[in-house]
Amino acid sequence: MIRICPIVRSKVPLLGTFLRSDSWLAPHALALRRAICKNVALRSYSVNSEQPKHTFDISKLTRNEIQQLRELKRARERKFKDRTVAFYFSSVAVLFLGLAYAAVPLYRAICARTGFGGIPITDRRKFTDDKLIPVDTEKRIRISFTSEVSQILPWKFVPQQREVYVLPGETALAFYKAKNYSDKDIIGMATYSIAPGEAAQYFNKIQCFCFEEQKLAAGEEIDMPVFFFIDPDFASDPAMRNIDDIILHYTFFRAHYGDGTAVSDSKKEPEMNADEKAASLANAAILSPEVIDTRKDNSN
């Protein structure tokens, strides 16, 4: 019987049967064994033996060869460090670029929720029923209205009432009037602010023309409403004790279209859906008498 190596016998058990001298498959099995032993390198060492390591005796190298090896090693380390530093600075640059793009909408979102920076609160989750109950107090807050128009916008934009007086928790409706003096249809967008800024956290707008862009045809004139209330917590805040006057200021800019969306010098607020608009109009029945009287005076 032809002898085969133990590794081949363990890997291919039937090969021993085929290698018997009386088997007609012996020549073919022998050729197969040689191919297996050659490919898996089983001729000279067993399966438990480790793969030979390629080593060399450094003492046989010349001084120049050793110096070249050291230079090669330092070059590889320097290349790795340079690549790491480049990756680090690229990551930092991308991070700051992303923060720069997200800073403006993030700032406006925070201001819309907290009233920071003189931005009135527009978070509709705060418009609960308990917030719309007027506080029983004799102190009314004077709300003054001001306006401004961008120099490149040929509009006239003015408040229809100079001021109204409201109680904390009392809803109020005011109007602005806008007219397009050009011979072309123009789309405008309004930004707003509250003064003093610390009172902005209590100024809540339920419905406002500034929530969406406004399109005026050539020569068209329209009334623009703003429906708002002062949070009842205003009356109990010691920091608001000496604040009797609040100014609501609007600035209109011309909208420009780049990628199909309108943009101005300031991002507009998210547009309310149909249900929210319907709820706002339904609440308009609770109006301040001062606003109604002022509205009538202006119409007369």
Curated annotation (Swiss-Prot):
GO terms for biological process: aerobic respiration; cell redox homeostasis; mitochondrial cytochrome c oxidase assembly; protein-containing complex assembly. Keywords: Copper, Membrane, Mitochondrion, Mitochondrion inner membrane, Transit peptide, Transmembrane, Transmembrane helix. Pfam families: CtaG_Cox11 (PF04442). Disulfide bonds: none annotated. One of its GO terms (molecular function) is copper ion binding. It is found in: Mitochondrion inner membrane. The gene is COX11. Exerts its effect at some terminal stage of cytochrome c oxidase synthesis, probably by being involved in the insertion of the copper B into subunit I. This is Cytochrome c oxidase assembly protein COX11, mitochondrial. Belongs to the COX11/CtaG family. It is a single-pass membrane protein. One of its GO terms (cellular component) is mitochondrial intermembrane space. The lineage of its organism: Eukaryota, Fungi, Dikarya, Ascomycota, Saccharomycotina. SUPFAM superfamilies: Ctag/Cox11. The chain crosses the membrane at residues 85-105. Residues 106-300 are mitochondrial intermembrane. Gene3D superfamilies: Ctag/Cox11.
